[in-house]
Amino acid sequence: DMRLISGIPPWCQMYFDRLSAKANGKKIKDIFKNFSLFVYGGVNFEPYRARIEESIGKKISTIETYPASEGFIAFQDAQQDKGLLLLADAGIFYEFIPTDEYFNENPTRLSLAEVELNKNYALIMSTNAGLWGYAIGDTVKFISKNPYKILV
């Protein structure tokens, strides 16, 4: 009895396709009657949403996470909220470079206290001891500063 699944949307879709094929084309809701939650991260879900919902065969709750090799960055803490709660107390020091300055020789690095709402920033992560600063290749936009919530 599978009640939830967590993963990267295209991999979950491949899993759903294999399950359906093994079950003579049944929808996931018919294979796992109590399936009700999909926790995802790693890529934008929207390009996969319609196909995954079709494979499942019913509306289910979803929760977005923002994991990275460098650390767990944020998660959706409210079902109706599109923003992700930034984990500001988990051993990662964040800095933010305005995207229009990213390729400058000495771009401005902003702390959490200095970011502005609805502006795009390149995300820089460091250890809390400041050992290194690493641009992970993602951009974020703050939609709240109390608490800090982002869109990736």
Q: What would you call each of these model-derived segments?
A:
Residues D1-V152:
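Active-site glycine/GP-rich loop and adjacent strand/helix microenvironment
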